[in-house]
Amino acid sequence: MSGSTLLSYQNGFLTYSKDGISYTDYKGNAMWNQTYDMQSPCVSVRSGWVAVGDYNGNLIYDISQDGTSKQIDTNLPVKSLSVAANGVVAAILEDGDVTWINVYNPTGEKAVGIKTTMQKSGYPVSVSLSDNGKLMMVAYLKAESGSMKSIVSFYNFDEVGQNYTDTMVSSYEYSDTVIPLAEFAGTHTAYSVGNNQFMLYEGNEIPKNIFQNFMQEEVQDVRSSGNYVAFIFNGTVSYTHLRA
């Protein structure tokens, strides 16, 4: 595939481009291949599941470890997506002045649709599902009184969440910071990264913000693997261990 990107996956690696995505094991054996036509593919991987969507397009492919795939037609432009370890997919979809956060079952059926607006909740910039797909975290960016603030909200799609408006069970605000990344690391541990701070959350039902660290330097990039997060600054790298 021309213009390909490689990602570590299972006992090998994924290769994806505008034309398709494939899984090759470390021995060089082609395990599966999914063709498509996308202008700007974005990929989410969790355990053996892979979700690939067309940024600003309307299609998502939800692919299991054996290569079985389900095509999801979102009907709206995809801005971001996340897959859980059981194949549940969450996607941020733009619809004019409204932005939707839809959750789809592995069958491709829409299970949840959350309506957001810039005035009420802010603009969702990042979404992530817990491994079991029961919790979802969303990082919002909102303008208020001439400055920007970020909001990290958690949704519970299980019984507990039914007692809350829009299933939102907890939410945390951070002034004068932009949080472009919010990620789950398992079923009950999650983290978010802003331009000048790092937050850690824990909870099986109602996640709590248990740790907040302000950074002296602005974060240039973030990489995560397993229980570790690496922060890339201007010329230096710092590692943080996540409690499982």
Regions found by a protein language model. Give the residues of each.
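Conserved small/polar residues in nucleotide/adenosyl-binding loops
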Residues: 240-244
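Repeated scaffold domains used in trafficking and secretory/extracellular systems
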Residues: 2-5, 38-45, 76-84, 121-128, ...
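Short glycine/acidic-enriched loop and turn motifs that connect beta-strands
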Residues: 57, 95-98, 142-146, 236-238
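A short beta-strand motif characteristic of beta-propeller blades
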Residues: 29-34, 67-73, 110-117, 165-172, ...
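Short beta-strand elements that form the blades of beta-propeller/WD-repeat-like
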Residues: 5-16, 48-54, 87-94, 134-140, ...
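N-terminal "mature head" segments of proteins
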Residues: 1-48, 53-56
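Short loop/turn segments that connect beta-strands within beta-propeller blades
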Residues: 26-27, 64-66, 105-107, 158, ...
